[in-house]
């Protein structure tokens, strides 16, 4: 059952300017794990990554129904790529014991657009998540 849907679009250049103005910008947006990935990238790819994560966290907060603020901050949400497929996954977020998150991040030219769909977990999905963690 769908709990919420969030979509966000960002101009990569604006995120780049924010980072160039304040180096602490990325540290405010990205978790420690995300920051380690960000620091490995060079040139435009670095800013595409940062804009993608910023946009994804905004989209999540819209799907969750709170926006970014007191209830949900950028550090409360972590997005990493699956080691086998490279697909982005929201691995940490508020309500992760009751909700399942699906994410899509797309870069095109000067823009990044993201969509997050939150679904309420059924008991079957909860059991599947539990069994995967046990491996």
From Swiss-Prot:
Binding site for Mg(2+): 8, 58
Keywords noted in UniProt: Cytoplasm, Fatty acid biosynthesis, Fatty acid metabolism, Lipid biosynthesis, Lipid metabolism, Magnesium, Metal-binding, Transferase
Acetylation recorded as keyword: no
Cofactor(s) this protein cannot do without: Mg(2+)
Catalytic reactions of this protein: apo-[ACP] + CoA = holo-[ACP] + adenosine 3',5'-bisphosphate + H(+)
Disulfide bonds: none
GO biological process assignments: fatty acid biosynthetic process
GO molecular function: holo-[acyl-carrier-protein] synthase activity; magnesium ion binding
Main localisation: cytoplasm
Subcellular location(s) of the protein: Cytoplasm
Cellular component aspect of the GO annotation: cytoplasm
EC numbers for this chain: 2.7.8.7
UniProt-recorded name of the protein: Holo-[acyl-carrier-protein] synthase
Gene for this chain: acpS
């Amino acid at each position: 059952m769908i709990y919420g849907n969030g979509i966000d679009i960002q101009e990569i250049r604006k995120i780049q300017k924010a980072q160039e103005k304040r180096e602490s910008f990325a540290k405010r947006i990205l978790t420690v794990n995300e920051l380690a990935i960000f620091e490995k990238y060079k040139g435009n790819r670095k800013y595409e990554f940062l804009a993608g994560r910023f946009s994804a966290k905004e989209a999540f907060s819209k799907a969750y129904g709170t926006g970014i603020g007191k209830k949900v901050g950028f550090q409360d949400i972590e997005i990493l790529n699956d080691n086998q497929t490279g697909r982005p996954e929201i691995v940490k977020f508020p309500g992760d014991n009751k909700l399942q998150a699906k994410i899509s991040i797309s870069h095109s030219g000067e823009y990044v657009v993201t969509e997050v769909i939150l679904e309420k977990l059924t008991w079957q999905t909860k059991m599947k998540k539990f069994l995967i963690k046990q491996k």
